[in-house]
């Protein structure tokens, strides 16, 4: 069914199409229209970070920023769903146009800039959902928050989402918020992770429930930077790491829109992200699980991430290009 409507969808503006589909999914998931995307997916349970996942294929953050469509995405058979990135206060994001399809490259460039309705609205939507599966909530800082005060934004979000998340992702790797990637390095990283770890342990006592903290990193790090970051993750007892976010690289692109600013996702990111996963797993010595994401568009590309050492995988751009059938295909062949 998706292959029938995809040409029509791809003729429209990417962001308008995105908004249209989210509107349909959020409003129609309880009606017969949901039969267009509902599917049975094989059970391939895996336990990671103390959490039982029905299968290892998840939805990456960024598609459902405000947690409006959790129920619909669960009907597609995802093993877990990650919503956000969410910030303490609602913000409009960057100027439009800010989302570009590179169909010749099976890729997307985005410079959205953490557009979202704010953490309170996301929590309201999560509470209204009937979803009982594994939910990750991805948190970030507001654009106008100075870099030296970023910790306050992450702590504010963590405090509000903690009771409703199965894990919380700390997004310090989007290329579309000025200064954000600086938090991946040195004392900035250690200070942030240390503060969040302290808050996590306090919240775990308060709610009598331990919610893992996961850090999402960029693919554009040098090898020694990945190794230093891995040591910081171990030192601050993080529970997981997502590798990777979008890339600033434009190597080998064919599309006329290749020069647009923003983060690149999709097939061109495939090998770059897998290489980071391999290096991370080697440095971490499997003491911290890795969630692999970046260019997964087939059984083979998912298996490459798992072979590199990832315990779970996430899809986004491949899902946009191929639809829900990608989930079932990957899970059934793992």
Curated annotation (Swiss-Prot):
It is a peripheral membrane protein. One of its GO terms (cellular component) is plasma membrane. Keywords: Cell membrane, Flavoprotein, FMN, Membrane, Oxidoreductase, Pyrimidine biosynthesis. One of its GO terms (molecular function) is dihydroorotate dehydrogenase (quinone) activity. Its main location: membrane. FMN binds at residues 61-65, 85, 138, 171, 216, 244, 266, 295, 316-317. It is found in: Cell membrane. Pathway: Pyrimidine metabolism; UMP biosynthesis via de novo pathway; orotate from (S)-dihydroorotate (quinone route): step 1/1. InterPro entries: Aldolase_TIM, DHO_dehydrogenase, Dihydroorotate_DH_1_2, Dihydroorotate_DH_2, Dihydroorotate_DH_cat, Dihydroorotate_DH_CS. It is an enzyme of class 1 (oxidoreductase). The keyword Cell membrane applies. Belongs to the dihydroorotate dehydrogenase family. Type 2 subfamily. This is Dihydroorotate dehydrogenase (quinone). It comes from Idiomarina loihiensis (strain ATCC BAA-735 / DSM 15497 / L2-TR).
């Amino acid at each position: 069914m998706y292959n029938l409507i995809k040409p029509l969808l791809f003729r429209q503006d990417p962001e308008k199409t995105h908004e249209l589909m989210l509107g349909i999914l959020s409003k129609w998931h309880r009606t017969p229209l949901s039969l267009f995307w509902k599917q049975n997916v094989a059970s391939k349970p895996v336990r990671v970070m103390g959490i039982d996942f029905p299968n290892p294929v998840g939805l990456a953050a960024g598609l459902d920023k405000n947690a409006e469509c959790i129920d619909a995405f669960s009907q597609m058979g995802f093993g877990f769903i990650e919503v956000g990135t969410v910030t303490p206060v609602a913000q409009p994001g960057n100027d439009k146009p800010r989302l570009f399809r590179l169909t010749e490259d099976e890729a997307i460039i985005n410079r959205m800039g953490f557009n979202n309705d704010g953490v309170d609205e996301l929590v309201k939507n999560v509470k209204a959902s009937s979803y009982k599966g594994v939910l990750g909530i991805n948190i970030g800082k507001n654009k106008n928050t100075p870099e030296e005060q970023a910790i306050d934004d992450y702590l504010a979000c963590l405090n509000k989402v903690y009771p409703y998340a199965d894990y919380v992702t700390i997004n310090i790797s989007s290329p579309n918020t000025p200064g954000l990637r600086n938090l991946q390095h040195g004392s900035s990283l250690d200070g942030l992770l240390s503060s969040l770890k302290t808050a996590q342990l306090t919240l775990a006592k308060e709610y009598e429930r331990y919610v893992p903290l996961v850090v999402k990193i960029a693919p554009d790090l040098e090898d020694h930077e990945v190794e230093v970051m891995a040591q910081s993750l171990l030192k601050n007892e993080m529970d997981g790491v997502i590798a990777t976010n979008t890339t600033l690289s434009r190597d080998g692109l064919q599309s006329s829109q290749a020069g647009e600013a923003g983060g690149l996702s999709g097939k061109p990111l495939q090998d770059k992200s897998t290489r980071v996963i391999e290096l991370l797993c080697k440095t971490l010595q499997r003491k911290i699980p890795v969630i692999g994401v970046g260019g997964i568009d087939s059984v083979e590309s998912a298996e490459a991430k798992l072979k590199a050492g990832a315990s779970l995988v996430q899809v986004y751009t491949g899902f946009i290009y191929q639809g829900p059938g990608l989930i079932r295909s990957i899970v059934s062949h793992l």
